[in-house]
Amino acid sequence: MAERSLMLVLHDVAPETWPDYRPFVEAVDALGQIPICWLVVPDFHRRNRLDDHVDFRRLLDGRLARGDELILHGFYHADEAPSPRTPRDWFMRRVFTHEGEFYPLSREESARRLQRGIELFQRHQWPLHGFVAPAWLLGPGARQALAATGLTYTSDPGHFYLLPDYRTVDAPGVVWSARSAWRRGMSRLVSERMLRRHQQSPVLRLGLHPVDMRHGFSRQYWLDLLTRLLADGRNTTVSDVIVSGQAHRKRY
């Protein structure tokens, strides 16, 4: 049987969200040496500037030393652009999410924010290979700007995309909508169905959000699922390992 990989991905990582994640991360660490992918927001909702939070940066330094990966995740993680003008844009920016920061941005503004994020990683000597847009939404301008950064990958809920040409790598992801009890119940059913469908997938990602950690039902599900997938023989890894391997195969 081919090797099957598993990635544990924490979205919306910021000083404000760390108290949500901390008990879960401690429980994961207690299971052994399990690498985690941290989607780091440089200034979450304009009130969490990483440059102002030395203790949190030291935490991230420590996670890198453990073998974790830090990934750039937007800049503000907030959609502050003018109101949408078309039905499609209204749906994407007001129904699907209110946090699709890079969906309405021009190429120029996208490039500016991407460069600021890259410079933050450089300033703190954090290796950087990937960018994941808030809510996985990249508008046309953002796609063009991201392709020119020199980063190696981005992703959406079902795929990695190798930059700069957005070549596709299948990587199904399990993600919850946990803001209400009925959504949490439905998310569990959908997740189990998806897991059965992708049981033999070479790559499987678990995409967690801070809101998942605020409810015992969803938090325990993620911990139990991680334990179950490890017992099923999946090997935990980080995004860059998978993407680097895929890029190598494409070249040779």
Regions found by a protein language model. Name each.
Residues P84-L105:
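Active-site gating loops and adjacent loop-to-helix segments of metal-dependent hydrolytic enzymes
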Residues P35-V40, Y153, V203, L208-Y252:
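C-terminal domain-boundary segment and adjacent tail
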Residues E69-R88:
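Short, solvent-exposed beta-strand-terminating loops
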Residues R167-F217:
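A conserved mid-domain beta-alpha-beta active-site/ligand-binding segment of alpha/beta enzyme cores
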Residues M1-E69:
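Active-site beta->alpha N-cap acidic-glycine motif
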Residues Y103-W176, R214, R219:
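Catalytic domains of cell-wall/extracellular-matrix polysaccharide-remodeling enzymes
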Residues D12-D20, P42-D55, A78, P82, ...:
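Acidic-and-aromatic substrate-binding clefts and catalytic sites of carbohydrate-active enzymes
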Residues L6-L10, I36-W38, L70-H73, L128-F131, ...:
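Hydrophobic faces of well-ordered beta-strands that scaffold small-molecule active sites
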